[in-house]
Amino acid sequence: MKQGLILKSVLSAAIIASLAGCATAPAQQWEADKTYKLTILHTNDHHGRFWQNQYGEYGMAARKTLIDQLRADIEAQGGSVLLLSGGDINTGVPESDLQDAEPDFKGMSKIGYDAMALGNHEFDNPLEVLFKQKEWANFPMLSANIYDKATGKRLFEPYHIFDKQGIKIAVIGLTTEDTAKIGNPEYIGGIDFRDPKEEAKKVIAELKKKEKPDLIIAVTHMGHYQNGEHGVNAPGDVALARYLPAGELDMIVGGHSQEPVCMEGPNLVKKNFKPGDECKPDIQNGTYIVQAYEWGKYVGRADYEFRNGELNMVSYNLIPVNLKKKVEVNGETQRVFATSEIKEDSAMLEFLRPFQEKGQEQLSIKIAHSNGKLEGDRNVVRFEQTNLGRMIAMAHMQRAKADFAVMNSGGVRDSIQAGDITYKDVLKVQPFGNIVSYVDMNGQEVLDYLNVVATKPVDSGAYAQFAGISMTVADGKVSNVVIGGKQLRLDATYRFTVPSFNAAGGDGYPKITDHPGYVNTGFVDAEVLKDYLEANSPIDVNRFAPAGEIVYR
């Protein structure tokens, strides 16, 4: 970590703050008894998806067309627009990751984002990369609760003031304090991620004294948890709204938990939201809370009316960006647009295409070398423990700082041959873009889980590969479970990883996404394996060879 870069950012934030402090807040600019229209558009958890996926869904070119059209329509009716992002622009697909998300940040600038919250994945790279990204963005990256440990000063602009037809809007940025424990220690050792609730309280007091805004919006990367039940995660948006005096924040535009925040009733999230469904935002302690799922799949739209200092939401919806659904046509399954197709912006496509092509080229660059075959052939990996299955599990275990790891063999799609290894080889093994997730459970829960997962039959994708654990599997249950060299204790707490697909119940695994100890790390499996291969090259395949840890009888 380079202190010069930190100091540069601290000085920049300090200058901004001092200038704000010197200025006298202007008198009220809006007209009494006049109704103003204000629309907040928002996305979150972009995770490198600047290009459409293989089915032609989402992507920044289609998003630009949609947002340009919305902005034009709203302004033609006399309204104003503010476009916000809940953060996590980084980490998701190799074409973006290999280029430090340059197409993503520059693409956001072209779309016209007004501000974003810093997400935890903005700290997956060295700070030099983040400050470079800050220069690519022509909009402020906000976070009031990130401090430099050495100076005690904020690293980033805590808030930004916008004027929309005389309505003074303060937008505060907040970042989950969990970044301190899920981020890379090498890059964040000198950074203090403070309690965002406390920092919000401080900043709001400062704003009321110095700026006297008409509206205060928090753009956050903290997560939305039903009824504030955040489990092992740091408190999220619901806790923030409840912590502050009623109505202190007019709105929270969130991210991090990567879900559509659509409510069925008070403190009850709507399950299985689909494109085109009605979406009612959460309301907590007088504050609207919204989130637009992930990857630019939706653009959230909140329409407000502002009159005599009062803000009222008129409507809210999540607009799908070329999402598709499966239908049966003449006995064959096809994907069709769930709603009307959005044409991709040609200028944005022209801008992004060189980045996509460059990213594809970089996939052929050598990342590691192996002295033997890493076994992932379907007729082997679905029948027995293999060195590749174990390596993938070990990579997940290391990234999540877990005690052991579970990896479904159906997620291992190919072998890696001896010799040079490229990223393309990795993507052949793990092409699905599953996310590494983990859960903290007590020993009894772990035993119950293993009794289901470890007993899955061979010759199926559900057959599990393991790392960090040994056991005997017989008569439909497990015994002699040893984790970290010690016998399983029913009253102890253990952390294990599992692909997001299986965490959601895929392959008939127990669904654990609702478990209070569950965490979706946001790290894509192929990226995690790539990093592990690079760090451990040259690869000695014998190191990963199973040694009878899992005994089937």
Curated annotation (Swiss-Prot):
Binding annotation for a divalent metal cation 1: D45, H47, D88, Q258
Textual note on the cofactor: Chloride.
EC number: 3.1.3.5
Signal sequence, renumbered to the chain: 1-21
Keyword Nucleotide-binding on entry: yes
Compartments in which it is found: Cell outer membrane
Function statement: Degradation of extracellular 5'-nucleotides for nutritional needs.
Protein name: 5'-nucleotidase
Source organism of the structure: Vibrio cholerae serotype O1 (strain ATCC 39315 / El Tor Inaba N16961)
Gene giving rise to this polypeptide: nutA
